[in-house]
C-alpha cells in the first residue's frame, strides 16, 4: 500500500461494510506455493439466519445454513446432493465455529490503515486490517486489504507476513474479486426450506 495512514473506524471505507445484514459474493483465488485454487464464495445474513457457500467447480460445493433462533445448522454437500442437520443447542459452543480468517465479524475492534493499493494498472482507495496469529509456534501477521470503488468493496487481498531466518517474507495467500456487496440479506438465500428441498437428508455419522 502507498500513502498509508492510521484512521478511526468512522473515517474508514470499511464502515460501510460493518452491518449485521449483508450479502457478499466473491470470486477467490487461494494461493499455496505453486498451487492456485479458484473458487466462488457467497455469504448472506439477516442477523439471525445465515447462508455460506463455497464452490470449487468440479471438486467441491458446500453450503452451510444456520439459524440462531432455532440453534440449528444444515450442512449441504452439493456434489452428493445431500445434507445433514446439527442441533447445536446441545453443545457449549457452536460446532460450526471455525478459524476462518477471511471473515471479520466486527471491524471496529481493529486498527485500520488506509491508503492506496494497486490491482493491475489501477490504484484503488484501500483499507487494511492486520492481526497476528501463531502457526506452528511461529508468529504470522495476517494483513487483509480491501480495495474500494466508491462505497463498494471491489477486491480483497490477504497477505501473510513472517520472519524467516531474519528476513521478512510476505506472501499473498488469497486474492478475491468482490462481484456483489449489498447491506441486506438476499431473500433467496434466506429461504432455507426451498434450498433444502433440492437435497436429500442423511444421518450424520457423528
Question: Locations of the language-model features?
Answer:
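An acidic-aromatic
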Residues: 33-103, 153, 159-179
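Short, intrinsically disordered, low-complexity terminal segments
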Residues: 123, 173, 180-184
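A sequence-composition feature that detects small, non-aromatic residues
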Residues: 32, 69, 126, 130, ...
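Poly-acidic low-complexity segments
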Residues: 67, 87, 106, 186-195
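Extended beta-strand-rich segments in extracellular/periplasmic secretory proteins, especially
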Residues: 3-11, 15, 21, 25, ...
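Short, exposed beta-strand "edge-strand" segments with a Pro/Gly-rich flavor and a Y/T-containing core
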Residues: 79, 137, 183-184
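N-terminal leader/targeting segments and the immediate start of mature chains
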Residues: 1-49, 116, 120, 183, ...
Amino acid at each position: 500500500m502507498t500513502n498509508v495512514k492510521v484512521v478511526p473506524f468512522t473515517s474508514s471505507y470499511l464502515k460501510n461494510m460493518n452491518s449485521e445484514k449483508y450479502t457478499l459474493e466473491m470470486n477467490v483465488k487461494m494461493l499455496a506455493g505453486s498451487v492456485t485454487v479458484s473458487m466462488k464464495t457467497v455469504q448472506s445474513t439477516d442477523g439471525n439466519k445465515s447462508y455460506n457457500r463455497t464452490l470449487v467447480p468440479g471438486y467441491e460445493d458446500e453450503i452451510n445454513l444456520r439459524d440462531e433462533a432455532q440453534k440449528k445448522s444444515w450442512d449441504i454437500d452439493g456434489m452428493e446432493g445431500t445434507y445433514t442437520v446439527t442441533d447445536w443447542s446441545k453443545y457449549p459452543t457452536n460446532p460450526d465455529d471455525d478459524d476462518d480468517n477471511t471473515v471479520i465479524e466486527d471491524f471496529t475492534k481493529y486498527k485500520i490503515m488506509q491508503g492506496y493499493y494497486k490491482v493491475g494498472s489501477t490504484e484503488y482507495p484501500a483499507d487494511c486490517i492486520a492481526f497476528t496469529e501463531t502457526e506452528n509456534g511461529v508468529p504470522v501477521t495476517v494483513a487483509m486489504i480491501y480495495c474500494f470503488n466508491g462505497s463498494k468493496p471491489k477486491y480483497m487481498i490477504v497477505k501473510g507476513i513472517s520472519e524467516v531466518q531474519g528476513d521478512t517474507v510476505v506472501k499473498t495467500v488469497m486474492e478475491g474479486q468482490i462481484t456483489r456487496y449489498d447491506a441486506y440479506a438476499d431473500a433467496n438465500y434466506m429461504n432455507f426450506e426451498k434450498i433444502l428441498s433440492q437435497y436429500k437428508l442423511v444421518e450424520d455419522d457423528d
